[in-house]
Amino acid sequence: MLVEEKKSGIIDSILERLGINEAPLFRTPDYMYNISYWLGAMVAASFAYTIITGLFLLLYYQPAFAYQSTQTIINSVPYGSVLLFSHLYGSYIMILLAYIHMFRNFYKGAYKKPRELQWVTGVLLLALTLGASFFGYSLVSDVLGVNAIDIGDQLLVGTGIPGATAIVGWLFGPGGSAALSSNPLVRSELFDRLLGWHIIMVFLLGVLFLFHFMLSERYGMTPATREKPKVPSYYTKEEQEKFNPWWPRNFVYMLSIVLITWGIILFVPNLLANINGLPIVINPYPAPQAGSPQAVSVQPYPPWFFLFLFKLVDFLLPNGIPITPILTIALLVVGLVILMLLPFLDPSDSLYVTRRKFWTWIMTTLAVYLVELSVWGYLEPGVPEPTSAQIEFLGPPLVIIGIIVYLWPTERKTKTVSTTATDSRVIKMNITPMEILLGAVGTLSFAATLFNFIQFPTLINGIILVPLGLFAIYALRRISFYVLGGKPVASVGNTSSRISLRKKIAFFGIIALFVVSLVLLGLMWTLPSVGPQATYAGMDLGVILLLWGVAIQLYHYEIFVKE
């Protein structure tokens, strides 16, 4: 017995006592070890990161002196700027990933039976994420945060609903004007209220996420359409017996995803913090303090994730009257309810997106409108838009998407690929949502750095420009290859010797990444730890976590992919 325990290892023995492998956790087929199936894990990793950093920031945040304590965190607390900027962008990336996760699940039919309740809770999680981010965004007491409070205040009061004023007082206390008060008790009343709501919503997010996780483990990830083309789409317990148990393979793969996600969350904002001329809505640094002379020249914007709503309130009705707050709120509520009830409104039993043409048209148009209205809201804030302008901007996408979806062939030839745990043949996606996200971030970062380098040709801007340029070229080539109809790359024909060679390359790749990460780790301790220059250490740590995540991905390939 003792010999068996030594062979199994201490960790295996502990997990055996806990009954992890007997727990009702989803067993995963080989082909699902693809980032597109794990977007929910990336959202969860972002959520966990924002909670951890938020707890540290809470130690230094003073509601009565919100803006001053924020500046203290940036300029005086060791690695405070790294914590604050990455906390902010952790929520930003969580929102982006939540949207990508939602639309990906729609196109894959993952909202259909038996996952209806999972979809409903997912939509509620997105709404709570936006709400928690709104209150957190306003805690800084900069002009943008206070303007966001005022916009929300005016929108709710303007509905004229009985009790609207009481609801506003319940949410915002004394209102945004309290941020301008010279009395710290008045300021504290506002920001204590905002902080309270921020924490409450994060708590509700955590509770609902646990329920969402339980539902996802109940039926597992939605199988590929080539495996289960119709509802109900899930693997039976008998089928799951052939797949990989949660420990250790799922744990290893998820760990790599967490590290890569955290690396991105750390690297992106700390890089952007060193780029001048960024749009104010995505700048990691706070805007000028509300009520300060510098704030007068700042264009009022809501958080970027509410820019679509910001533009919507600029719309004029056909009679030339501005859209009313009650109509705006009604549109949002009705849209949210329809989105939640989508599993019950779509009667089709097929998971193929080409057999769900009406809802594919609606959801694709929604995705385009979210982006289009957000960009429009940033470029032309507060400009009243007549019906003719609305038709000019919103009409073409509606028609073009409708024509494409209608003409898209319904039938599609697919190849059947074995999903047993012993089958190492995997069809690789040509491009994943994560690659698109990283490509967009890299390309935008390159464009901003290039613009900044032209204006301020400093050494650091030139150094940053080179890797960003190479990454942008690579990302654009990948995306263009996909758009122009490039064929997916498959590893079905891989021989045992080729897999063996790749495993050897992976082994030496792990060693190389480990050595590079050690060098970067040593470098990090030589970089400034206080003030804005601490962002260099933040970028360094982000790269280290990315390298560790990639190394674990290579380890996963070397250990678990069978020859």
UniProtKB/Swiss-Prot annotation:
Localization per record: Cell membrane
GO CC terms in record: plasma membrane
InterPro entries registered for this protein in UniProt: Cyt_b/b6_C, Cyt_b/b6_C_sf, Cyt_b/b6_N, Cytb/b6-like_sf, Cytochrome_b-type_ET, Di-haem_cyt_TM
GO biological process, any: respiratory electron transport chain
Cysteines joined through disulfide linkages: none
Keywords of this entry: Cell membrane, Electron transport, Heme, Iron, Membrane, Metal-binding, Respiratory chain, Transmembrane, Transmembrane helix, Transport
Binding site for heme 2: 101, 212
One Gene Ontology term of the molecular function aspect: oxidoreductase activity
UniProt: heme 1 binding residues: 87, 198
Membrane topology (UniProt): Multi-pass membrane protein
Transmembrane feature ranges: 36-61, 81-104, 119-141, 193-220, 255-276, 326-345, 358-379, 387-409, 436-454, 458-476, 505-527, 539-557
Keyword rRNA processing: no
Record-stated family: Belongs to the cytochrome b family.
Record text on subunit structure and interactions: It is a component of at least 2 distinct terminal oxidases, the quinol oxidase (SoxABC) and the alternate quinol oxidase with the core components SoxM and a Rieske Fe-S protein.
Function: Binds 2 heme groups (b586 and b606) which are not covalently bound to the protein.
Protein name (Swiss-Prot/TrEMBL): Cytochrome b
Species this protein is from: Sulfolobus acidocaldarius (strain ATCC 33909 / DSM 639 / JCM 8929 / NBRC 15157 / NCIMB 11770)
